[in-house]
UniProtKB/Swiss-Prot annotation:
GO molecular function, one term: ADP binding
Chain residues that bind ATP: 205, 337, 363-366
Alphabetized UniProt keyword annotations: ATP-binding, Cytoplasm, Glycolysis, Kinase, Nucleotide-binding, Transferase
Enzyme class: transferase
Binding sites annotated in the UniProt record for substrate: 24-26, 40, 63-66, 121, 154
Keyword set includes Kinase: yes
One GO CC annotation: cytosol
Subunit record text: Monomer.
Name used for this protein in its record: Phosphoglycerate kinase
Length: 407
């Protein structure tokens, strides 16, 4: 799925042209409205710099949070200020997304200028992918760049609808990097390929596991989702969090214990190594312990809840990482936010950092864990989109990517 990128545009495509750029500036704010982590703003700098350097007039569009209509707390004013500091130039800020005032602000732009529109989700038309709203957005510019991988799995007006009315429509540098790394891991990886899956709910990762079984040589399971697989095989899970069924959107119930057995059987049939924890670190309640007890085997005693993989499992999983050519990591091995139960997740993170394989970390919790372990700069690629990377790895088409011009 090769898409045309911003790098493919020539000087004539950029100089003096108005470029509408969808970025992901959905950054965390504290109670006083200060940005607590500007990673997502920094991630967009290469694309913005390339466009302004080429003389384009850049119009940025992003969402922030989940507003219900206009909400002063979720205006993009602090983002414009921080972006200006990072770019070393004034970033103009519009008080709206569409309308006469915005059109006036766009008219005033000179080559190399940057204008940030207000939070696009102030308009319910954005998430409804309303064609008129998309058309009004498209009317502001002469070319469209999508650099927001984090929302590429959403068919919204600013991510998908706008590309119907504005050409060229190309991928920004960040989106291009995401597609290259994730695409390589799925289509032409260095073997053997290992998928590390973790997190609390197996129901969130069913499609991911199903798709991975057709792509990888081995799978490691950690986190609370491992207890579903263990319980399905008759292992005692004590008081651990263990999902046994889930309800689909159509109201039907899925027996997750049976599904776990089916997935294990499919792995065996396909010759995929499927590893589960052989020991655990536990507590008698959900909370931290400086030196948690370790189970002698996979069984978890009554009244105890497993909150992390144990040292034997760590060794097993680290060895698997070391012999793999490509590793896709999606989800922590335990409750890594609690220091006493962070060892399993951090052991995996450090093993990835120290090996010379292609290591790809799906966004969300795994990205936070990699950051907390201090290994982000030693990994091949840490995705900026949790939901988007998950859907891409599940084999789904991302609407925000499908809408762009073919290379």
């Amino acid at each position: 799925m090769a898409k045309k990128t911003v790098e493919a545009l020539g000087a004539a495509d950029l100089k003096g042209k108005r470029a509408l750029v969808r970025v992901d500036f959905n950054v965390p704010l504290d109670e006083s409205g200060q940005i607590t982590d500007d990673t997502r703003i920094r991630a967009a700098l290469p694309t913005i710099g390339m466009l302004t350097g080429g003389g384009a007039r850049v119009i940025l569009v992003s969402h922030l949070g989940r507003p219900k209509g206009f909400d002063d707390q979720l205006r993009l004013t602090p983002v414009a200020k921080r972006l200006g500091e990072l770019l070393g130039q004034t970033v103009y800020k519009a008080d709206d997304v569409i309308g006469p005032e915005v059109e006036e602000a766009v008219k005033k732009l000179e080559d190399g200028d940057v204008l940030l529109l207000e939070n696009v989700r102030f308009y319910p038309e954005e998430e409804k992918n309303n064609p008129e709203f998309a058309q009004k957005l498209a009317g502001l510019a002469e070319l469209y760049v999508n650099d927001a991988f984090g929302t590429a799995h959403r068919a919204h007006a600013s991510t998908e609808g706008v590309a119907r009315y504005l050409r060229p429509a190309v991928a920004g540098l960040l989106l291009q990097k995401e597609l290259e790394y994730l695409g390589k891991a799925l289509e032409s990886p260095e073997r053997p390929v290992l998928a590390i899956m973790g997190g609390a709910k197996v129901s969130d990762k069913i499609q991911l596991i199903q798709n991975m079984l057709t792509k990888v040589d081995s799978i490691l399971i950690g986190g609370a989702m491992a207890y579903t697989f263990l319980k399905a095989q008759g292992v005692d899970v004590g008081a651990s969090r263990c999902e046994t069924s889930t309800t689909k959107k159509d109201g039907t119930t899925v027996d997750l214990l049976q599904l776990a057995l089916d997935l294990l059987a499919e792995a065996k049939e396909r010759g995929v190594t499927f590893l589960l924890p052989v020991d655990h670190r536990t507590n008698d309640k959900f909370g931290d312990l400086a030196d948690p007890p370790v189970t002698p085997d996979a069984n978890i005693p009554e009244g105890q809840m497993a909150l992390d993989i144990g040292p034997k499992t760590e060794e097993l999983y680290v060895a698997e990482v070391q012999k793999s050519g490509t590793v896709i990591w999606n989800g922590p091995m335990g409750v890594f936010e609690l220091p006493g139960f962070s060892k399993g997740t951090f052991a995996v993170a450090h093993a990835l950092a120290e090996s010379d394989n292609l290591s790809i970390v799906g966004g969300g919790d795994s990205a936070s864990a990699a950051e907390k372990a201090g290994v982000v700069d030693k990994l091949s690629h840490v995705s900026t989109g949790g939901g988007a990377s998950l859907e891409f790895l599940e084999g789904k088409t991302l609407p925000g990517v499908a809408a762009l011009d073919e290379a």
